[in-house]
Amino acid sequence: MSRPRGLLRAGYPYLKTLGMRRVTNFPIDIAFGKDEILYVLLRESGNAFIRIWSFDDAESFTDDLVQIGSYGKNAGQFQWPVQLITNAKDEIYVSDEANHSISIFNSKGNFLSRWGKQGTQKGYFNGPAGISFDHEGNIVVVDSSNHRIQKYTNDGKFICQFGKLGDKEGEFKRPWGVHVDELGKIYVADWGNHRVQVFTNDGDFIMVIDETSIAGLKMKYPSGVAVDAHGDIYVSDWGNNRVLMFDSNGRYVWRFLGDATLSKVARSYMMTNAYSNRLREMANIEEDKYLRKPTSIRIDSKFRLCIADHMSYRLQVYQKDAIELDEHTIFSTMRNPSLTTA
């Protein structure tokens, strides 16, 4: 898909909330499957697994919930998982900081394989965090505690690496999230340096995004990054409880603070729980809508933005509303742009 010359940005309205406590506790990441399926990675102390959910949510709360994996050190288990991605076959790849490995499952949740060893040498991990496929099907891995980015084949053969500890261009301090766009650019959420860095597919530095055009909107511990088909860049600004949006040149465009409502499954649950309804009647409902420690963002082919609202046990979903422009509907880039009115 080629990118448009420009966009008429009509807005980015809130669409819905998915999940609830007991169903999607502490979501850390999201991946898209076929037929409107969502794979939601859940993580808390002593518990970790993937919840299979749907964009349609659920009509009612049920104990018959489908999950992949469980907590532990053995094959098919997780201790401290961070991110998950899916390929064309709907196979699921999951990084695990504590197990220093990448685990692979099929779409039905059957364990296929696991690779990775702890160490500081090339091809070894020390807390693998973000993962992303590149345009050749290789896997880019954020080797967080080794402060570097490594690339592997999809079966775990080491290809190359770049980066080291520091705060200069091309250096990292406990990086976390990563995304490779369709042009091959690598975007890294440089957690400890409070910025996002962008690189070529070979690891050459392109640019840094670390603040916006509005005072007070500097990043604080960004945990995730994603890029949509238009080239717009989204950052989960974890330490500031928000998601920031930039255009392909790193120019600030938008921020998401949270607009959550009760999900379909939560409404069904509340209608069977009189005590919870009384507590909600007494609560400050406005505060409940805001994001709390959003850890990851994902954008699907329909330009739906899904935010893992970690400390609120839910996903918040927004729908991008933008019209693609061509050479007939937008001027060429101006050297000294200014807004004028007739």
Regions found by a protein language model. Give the residues of each.
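Eukaryotic scaffold repeat domains enriched in small/polar residues
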Residues: M1-A342
